[in-house]
Regions:
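N-terminal membrane topogenic signal
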Residues: 1-13, 70-72, 185
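Functionally important transmembrane alpha-helices
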Residues: 22, 161-218
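Membrane-interface capping segments at transmembrane-helix boundaries
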Residues: 54-61, 229-245
Length: 245
């Protein structure tokens, strides 16, 4: 399937990933340990996808390698550390029993790899060959689409905060795809994605008011947008950009 159509291959992975995660939710409840089935499904998918990439020697094509661009050109990735630490700005809390905590960490670690490889690796690369702008937009927006569900799931946040969450997710999507296609490595994207997800497990948000949350998200959006603009202006352009002008 991959050799016939890379885009179809990417879409199949997206569908399988979403279906398995949906099926995992009721299984987590039956097992009685949060994220247990989710972690198991993610581990299996991670192993299969990584083995496929290794077998077909596609690691470099999809960014599982170091970047040829020096770290100083990325400001030593300090803004990514700031973004990853955002969940801990209001303090640290241990809210779950240790079995669920372990399952959450394992699941989120794998989710970082899977979502970056599927959306910013497989999907972006398949589209970028023909239309770089479309690839950037689609890859970035899909990162924010999942947050729309917070508008309807009774998360407790008002619609303004939820919309800011979506804007932040889309902004992060643009940032990560810029790091990948300008820097040639998906590893920083995987690491920061996993870190943001994992640290959310230990976030202290019991006393976080809507106003504080809005300020929090606003700062993260500002850091993300500023960092993206700096990278787009200073990093070397990818050959795709020159060939599609």
């Amino acid at each position: 399937l991959y050799e016939k159509n890379e885009l179809t291959f990417a879409i199949v992975w997206i569908v399988v990933y979403c279906v398995l995660q949906s099926l995992a939710n009721p299984l987590n409840q039956r097992i009685g340990i949060g994220y247990s089935a989710s972690a198991a499904f993610c581990i299996v998918q991670t192993i299969i996808l990584f083995a496929f990439l290794r077998k077909n020697k596609l690691e470099k094509r999809y960014g599982l390698c170091g970047s040829p661009v020096p770290a100083r050109r990325f400001l030593y990735y300090v803004p990514l550390v700031i973004l990853a630490s955002g969940n801990l700005w209001n303090g640290v809390a241990f809210r779950y029993a240790w079995p669920e905590t372990v399952c959450r960490i394992v699941c989120m670690l794998c989710v970082g790899f899977l979502e970056e490889m599927i959306f910013r690796g497989l999907l972006f690369t398949a589209i970028a060959k023909d239309n770089l702008k479309s690839a950037v937009i689609i890859s970035s927006v899909t990162f924010g689409i999942g947050h729309i569900i917070n508008l309807f799931n009774g998360s407790g946040m008002d619609w303004v905060n939820n919309l800011c969450q979506i804007v932040f997710a889309v902004a992060v999507g643009f940032l990560l795809v810029t790091i990948f296609y300008r820097g040639g490595s998906l590893l920083p994207c995987i690491l920061v994605h996993s870190a943001i997800n994992i640290l959310s497990t230990f976030a202290e948000d019991t006393n976080l008011t809507a106003g504080m949350h809005l300020l929090h998200i606003g700062i993260l959006i500002a850091v993300t947008v500023a960092y993206t603009l700096i990278l787009t202006q200073t990093l070397p352009k990818h050959p795709w950009e020159a060939s599609q002008r």
